[in-house]
Amino acid sequence: MSTMLPTPRLLADGLKMVESGRWHDGRLWLAHWGSGEVIAVDLAGNKEVVAPGRNTMGWSLAWLSDGRLLVSGEELTRVEPYGSTVRHSAQGGNELAVDPADHVFVNGADFDFVGGGAPEPGWIRLIDEDGTARDVAGDIDFPNGMVVTPDGSTLVIAESFAGRLSAFDIGPDGALSGRRTWADGLGPDGICIDPEGGIWTQTADTAAHTGDDNAPAGAVVRVLDGGEITHRVETDLPCFSCALGGPDGRHLFLLCNEFEGVDQLEAVLSRRSARIYVTDVPF
């Protein structure tokens, strides 16, 4: 039996679509889809545009160890210390992850999801220091959020269409091997990992997945390697991304959006109905 977390409280609203939440430098940073902005939100709910993003859907954030911000999308860009934006790699993609050795991983799939294209298997690519990209994993069933375990040894990716978290060993050169299932039967999107190695991910027992109007609109659980679920929290909108942060790292931020299908994205964006919630966790 999992433990239910405290009811989440509203941190910020009035946003278009919120994704790729990351705690950085004392604030929650996120990709503000539909606005082309990277936004930072403090614990009082104050919002600030801190960097340029993308005018498209499907992009995210990560940082190199020296503090420079990476932004994915049609290409991978880097924000320099004095605010200028430069190309880091011509390789575009969706989600990003950077390990302690500064291996930069980007994922994506070669079909037009927003345009209703037929699904194709996705990939993970490693971006070398000179910006070149090489495949390190394939046959990913709609790649989404990625995290690196606290010891830097393992990359875990959300395969959204499969309802699965898959794990890979990270080699000294950034190569991935030893693919295995971390947990399945889920509804993963943007995920995060705590210092004890528990991954916080979306579930598949929500209204959108089940068609049950009595099911919660959104739910996030903490799942251990092997599939054991230890904690749960529910939201009144679908949760697209979650992030751990706060002064002691024990705030769980829940980035929630309306979703009525890709053909209704513009209508959803125009309503500015996205919300960010926060609750407390024991880790």
Where are these regions (language model features)?
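A short helix->beta-strand "capping" segment at the edge of beta-propeller domains
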Residues: M1-G14, L43-G45, T279-P282
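Beta-rich, blade/repeat-based domains predominating
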Residues: A12-D25, G53-G73, A90-D112, A118-W123, ...
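Beta-strand initiation motifs
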Residues: M1-T7, G45-V49, Y82-V86, I127-R134, ...
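Short, solvent-exposed loop/turn segments at conserved positions within beta-propeller repeat blades
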Residues: W33-G34, F111-P121, S160-G163, A208-A217, ...
